[in-house]
Amino acid sequence: PLLAPFYGTWQVYKGIDGEHTHRNRWRYALDFHQVEKGRSYTQDGSRLSDYLCFGRPVLSPAFGTVIRLRDDLPDNQPGSIDLKNNWGNYIILQADSGVFVLLAHLMRGSIRVKRGDRVAPETIVAACGSSGRSPQPHLHMQVQQHASLGSSTLPLHLVSSLIQRGDTPIQFQLVASPSEGNSVRRAVEDHQLAAAVQLPIGRTLSYSVTGADGACHEEELRVDVSLLGQMRLLAENGAAAAFENQNATLAFYDRQGKSNELLDLWCLALGLTPLSSDAARWEDAPPAKLLPMSLMQRSVVAVARPLGAGIDSRYEREWVEAEGVWKQMGDHQLHIANRVLRARTVAILSPTAGCISLMLECCGKSMQADLTKYGQIADLGVPRWESAVDTENSNRANS
């Protein structure tokens, strides 16, 4: 998986299996350029400087090491190509995963790295150019088997991206394979939103949980780390879910242990949470066991889907200005045996207190969990502390 190798919004100029050059063993490649109002240039497009992407920073798409590069070829004037040096100026990186990544058609003299340099996804490595087989400025990216120039390509996809197809709303995609004409932007972490779901080791979250029968009880979740370094959110009865926070995304997985409605609600409502404030819509497929199903319903799922079933979950998020919180809403559908089990979740996220409220509606029943206090478990040199929460904001935002 690769991050988009640029700042801002670019468009896929040529996608996988694109005509002319993205064919046969070079089929898995993406070309990017910038477009405004359907044009990739200003003025009359006769000069390289007219093109929106020309000279823009090119970023490393992954952690890795610079293996090969070339930086001396001239940039073609618009409409011209260099067939002797197809790739133009280029950088080949070996990603930490072992594969090789080619960034091509770079601007002459713009490469900022040298062989052997370590790079990270935020490292500016060069500038977009028009060298090689490039009739207009653009950036070519491919994943390949070997370090040699022109090596066979491998399937590639982008992670944590904001994708727009035509006039449709922008959608966050954890894993994306954008097509020609799609607009692509790297999801950039919003620090306030990230703070709202920050889960450091030793954090405790105490909720007042109201079940479908109206009964209310207190329950605590806490954050711990396993012997192997896996971050986990733990319930009082030992139920647990692992999570990772990287590439501007909080993601929960590996739900283990006993049944726990509060932890399951948390994972259903917040299991995939992009930390970019520009991410207003996204989809996921969490496991069916997170839904509060009856024994009969679970039996039907087990028979119909013995290898496991995923929920069709669609999320939207908005900022509630009056309350100073984010409202993250999920619509969930499980299709089993010609029937559809529907559920709705709402999570209220405060920049200071975190997830202050969770709500679930499913099969005519409801569940509400309101944060009453949050704190930190004592550690050597770290004192224990707790802070109470005013739940009025969450109740108003939920209404």
Regions found by a protein language model. Name each.
Residues 53, 61-107:
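Zn2+-dependent peptidoglycan hydrolase active-site motif and core
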Residues 1-37, 42, 340-342, 348-351, ...:
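Non-catalytic extracellular/periplasmic "stalk"
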Residues 10-12, 56-68, 122:
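Generic structural motif
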Residues 112-114, 130-137:
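Short glycine/proline-centered loop/turn elements that form peptide/ligand docking sites
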Residues 99-122:
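Short histidine-centered loop motifs in beta-beta connectors
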Residues 85, 142-261:
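Acidic, glycine-rich catalytic/binding loops that coordinate metals and/or anionic ligands
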Residues 208-393:
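N-terminal accessory interaction module
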Residues 119-132:
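Short hydrophobic beta/alpha edge segments that flank linear recognition/processing sites
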